[in-house]
Amino acid sequence: MKIGTIKTLEELEAVRAYWERWQDHPNNDFAQFKMVCQLRPEVESPCVVVIERNGQPQALLAGRLEKTQFAPPIGYIKPVRIPAKVMAVLHEGILGQVDDEAVLESVEYLWSLLRSGVADAIEFHHLSEDSPFLNALQLHRSGWFCDPPPRWSVHWEMTLPAEGAFIEHKVRSKHRTGIRKKERDLESAFPGKVSWRWMNRFDDIPGMCARLEEVAARAYQRGLGTGFMDNEEYRRRFALFGGRGQLRIQLLEIDGRVRAFWFGYVYQGVFHLSETGYDPELSKYEVGTLMFIRLNDELAKEGVRTLDFGIGDALYKRRFGDRSWQETTVWLFAPTAKGLALRLIMGLLSAVDKFGRNVIQRIGILDQLKTGWRRRLAPRKSSADPEYPMTEKI
């Protein structure tokens, strides 16, 4: 077995055929990975670990070297920001087939990279609870230079009804009347002006991005530095997935203006939800729920049978999801003074965050506090639907 690292875009071409054969998620898509490495200023280079056996790649760890700000959060607050070089292994970034031997040797290889000074830390973003790498990283910890015990989050999926009619199959009867009333109220408030548009073909990507930006600019995600933004990266991402026929966008237009949106990507038969936003003036009509119902009906018509809600838990995911698993982000820190300092800071802030969450959960006001913080972070006079947050590192 041989393990090495690719650190240039040119070298990536040597494993491209294997990568594209194994890719199964928008996050680990080769073309998108390459695009992000080219566009994001914080990305110093690719850092892809290649595991070979008998001269052929057996597996890949898709990562990037990033000059970033190490900023462990307490809730939505990031009290410290420390410049650091981090090797970020993407969510769903483990490609190919790995056995126990390959996993153990790969973990040792990653520690050797840290000892050599390649990075101050390595981040495995949201490893699944059944990942062999998670088990190996937990078993072969290196004392002070591993992160605290796992902080789990729940990842949800949903099976779509084959015959459509999402509201009939997934919404309880006592809620259907209320949802239909909200829809009638919306139509009454804007008679003849409401249009729901499902888009799977795109002729004007820049124009579409500009229209979405009118809504996204007022969303709370913008205050967090997440969510959709009309920039070169999103335009090229839309062009990439739209050109393949994988991009889907649900729009609510009123009098020709976009007032709400939700988009995602169909990838190997699974729809991956991405970003959403809506005009806060429409909050009383629960347009997030109305969009979600239409989106699922349109997907069912196309033959899509699985919807992936993406990273993180939320009330609507628990309400509609029918399959879930746990995930956690794992950090390894370089055996240096800086690595130790980063580890200690993460341990302290994680302990404060955990204590605060436990207190808030016992009081029973966690959801209310989340909503309040999101509204506070949103630009003045606006917010996005607090029950529909979407963030995912790619």
Could you say what each language-model-derived stretch is?
Residues 65-67, 134-166, 254, 302-364, ...:
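Active-site/acyl-donor-binding loops of N-acyltransferases
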Residues 45-46, 52, 67-150, 268-326, ...:
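Acyl-donor binding region in acyl/amide transferases
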Residues 78, 89-91, 150-154, 183-186, ...:
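Short, surface-exposed, polar/charged, turn-prone segments marking secondary-structure boundaries
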Residues 39-42, 84-88, 95-100, 157-163, ...:
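Low-complexity, flexible helical/coil segments
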Residues 371, 379-380:
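Acidic, carboxylate-rich catalytic segments that either coordinate divalent cations
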Residues 2-80, 126-155, 159-284, 382-394:
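A conserved beta-strand-loop-helix scaffold within acyl/acetyltransferase catalytic domains
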